[in-house]
Amino acid sequence: MNVPAQPPTWSLHPQLGADTSNIGDLPLARVLLMNDANYPWLVLVPRRPDIVEVIDLDDEDQEILWREIALLARVLKDVTQCDKLNIAAIGNVPQLHVHVVARRRGDAAWPRPVWGAGPPRPYEAPERDRLVAAIRREIAFG
């Protein structure tokens, strides 16, 4: 008997899960909050299996991802009143993820990039919960 192969399933890379809190799901991407209170920092992870680079997504998913990045960037800017947004698909975790980081003049790394600027400062639960609630008020997560 020939049993059809099961399609691959998506799961969050353990390193991304260890460093973040789940905010919710958009049509394509899971939205995570990086556990670093030095910077309001979101991570979007497309919920597609075996995707490492943006170019691994089909054209439609690439367009959806950029719309979701823009949506989250606008919300993060409004919620944090930041001076600048940093948006990047950077790092070596072998699962596509896009960082959206709110920056303020005088933050712990300003004006340098946040990567490698110093140790993360984990969120206290009330501070994290306030930021997550503010973001959820602006976006209808699935």
Segments (PLM) and residue ranges:
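HIT superfamily nucleotide-processing domains
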Residues: 1-142
